């Protein structure tokens, strides 16, 4: 099988079957792969003649041009069968056939190094919701196994979760309902770029380039958020909203769902209270409770008993010395996320040539950021460990 041709075919199928990925998977399994669906006689697509009509050479030509533009723009397209594809999302019965990714590090570094916890909720959040969204993310940053924070880059809970994660040195991933080159809302363009530059972070979508933010697209985005994460935390939600759909998707994928309780007379808490009442979500009673349920270890309080994060001291120190887009920052944060990593594994995680890995790791060790053992496995040096 020609891998490049198969990726082109997957990109084409992703456009055709974006709202019916499970159907595409069934067709691929029966035909023996994505490219096999574009033969002289495309297989019948029962109930969807409009989809069958698109299984032709013109769509493959479009996909080839699409992938060229993606690469030229500095983005990545990851097919469902690629080893870089998010492992939890691949386990879902209806995973996207491909993902467009924008980040400064390798997809493996984004998707495979640590647990992923989604924070979702209303755009119209209350001061109570904002406070507890921040406190919970801050507390998770102080656990033994800090997670990656996943959300949807929207106003309200999404934006607070992403920004707090960055402030605490946590990686964070934003799932968009637009093309990878568009950020919606536009007011979050700076936030998205900060995420793209941060180690272990980035933004992604399953929509082709040029896709506008129409309402229907957000259902697919919510499905991806639920599939990416080990657990979903609903911070605030009205009785109807996208975050409740995300919670239901998560339940269908056998993910853990948590909800922050709110006042009985606050419409912005009706959805959370209903999830708890109907036993569709576990109640969040404290940051310690959430961390324990997630299996991340007990969070350690900061000075004065506060959950406030330290601002990502290790990351800040690396950025100050080497720059926000430096190889030193990327490699240092990869070691911080996965201590005891050798040069070969770092080469795969960070995507640098082996000699450059040794050069950068040696510099970080000489500057007091890393230590190594006799097997040349690197870990953060005290006090960063």
Describe each PLM feature range.
Residues 1-84, 367-384:
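Short, small/acidic-rich helices and loops at N termini and domain boundaries
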């Amino acid at each position: 099988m020609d891998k490049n041709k198969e990726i082109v075919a997957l990109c084409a199928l992703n456009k055709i079957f974006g709202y019916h990925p499970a159907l595409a998977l069934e067709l691929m399994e029966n035909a023996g792969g994505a490219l096999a669906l574009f033969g002289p006689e495309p297989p019948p697509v029962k109930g969807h003649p409009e989809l069958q009509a698109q299984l032709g050479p013109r769509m493959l030509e479009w996909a080839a041009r699409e992938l060229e533009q993606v690469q030229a723009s500095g983005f990545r397209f990851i097919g469902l069968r690629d080893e870089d594809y998010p492992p939890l999302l691949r386990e879902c019965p209806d995973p996207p056939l491909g993902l467009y990714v924008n980040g400064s590090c390798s997809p493996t570094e984004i998707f495979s190094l640590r647990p992923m916890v989604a924070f979702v909720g209303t755009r119209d959040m209350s001061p109570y919701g904002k406070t507890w969204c921040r406190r919970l993310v801050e507390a998770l940053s102080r656990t033994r196994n800090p997670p990656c924070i996943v959300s949807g880059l929207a106003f309200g809970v999404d934006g607070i979760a992403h920004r707090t994660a960055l402030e605490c040195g946590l990686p964070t991933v934003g799932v968009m309902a637009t093309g990878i080159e568009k950020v919606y809302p536009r007011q979050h363009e700076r936030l998205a770029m900060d995420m793209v530059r941060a180690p272990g972070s980035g933004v992604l979508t399953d929509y082709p380039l040029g896709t506008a933010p129409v309402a229907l697209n957000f259902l697919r985005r919510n499905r991806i958020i639920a599939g990416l994460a080990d657990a979903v935390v609903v911070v605030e939600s009205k009785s109807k909203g996208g975050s409740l759909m995300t919670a239901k998707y998560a339940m269908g994928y056998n993910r853990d769902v948590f909800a922050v309780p709110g006042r009985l007379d606050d419409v912005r808490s009706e959805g959370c209270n209903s999830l708890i009442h109907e036993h569709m979500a576990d109640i969040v009673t404290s940051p310690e409770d959430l961390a324990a349920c997630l299996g991340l270890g007990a969070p350690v309080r900061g000075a004065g008993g506060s959950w406030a994060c330290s601002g990502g001291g290790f990351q800040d120190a690396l950025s100050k010395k080497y720059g926000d887009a430096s190889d030193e920052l990327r490699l240092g944060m990869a070691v911080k996320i996965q201590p005891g990593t050798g040069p070969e594994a770092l080469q795969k995680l960070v995507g640098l040539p082996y000699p450059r890995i040794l050069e950068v790791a040696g510099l970080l060790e000489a500057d007091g950021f890393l230590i190594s053992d006799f097997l040349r496995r690197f870990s953060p040096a005290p006090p960063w460990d």
